[in-house]
Amino acid sequence: MVDVTIATGASDNLHAALQRLVPQLSSSNPPPSFDELDRVCRHEANSFFVASDETGIVGVLTLVVFPIPTGIRAWIEDVIVDDAARGKGVGRLLNEAAIEHAFGQGAITVDLTSRPSREAANRLYQRIGFEARDTNVYRYHKPDLSTGS
């Protein structure tokens, strides 16, 4: 059975799990240090969801909820389900818990992005009820002053 909780701070167990899980999501971003993870868990806008089963931590999700002039905005970020736990409903449980939590904080929509290459994840999001938005997503990178670019 999978249990989903919200971490209120970093622990050695959670930090070790992130060292294993983050590389499964991104090869360009290193796993967080213990202090970085603790800051994420404790940040007032964040809820850091942790899925565990009898084997240990099998997935995580970050929900960010913040007020803007047009309402309460909610974003799901960094959904990671351990390769060994995929296809067992962990991603669905994490997302459903986050959506319920966001609505409880006053959000009326929840957004997320997912690379097209993550086909299984995109199918899951659509089955849950997420819809593709008619919008563009842009990213601005901090210039590297050492190279002038």
Residue ranges and their predicted role:
Residues M1-D12, P143-S149:
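Conserved N-terminal entry element of GNAT/NAT acetyltransferase domains
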Residues V81, G87-E100, R123-R127:
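Conserved acetyl-CoA-binding loop-helix of GNAT-fold acetyltransferases
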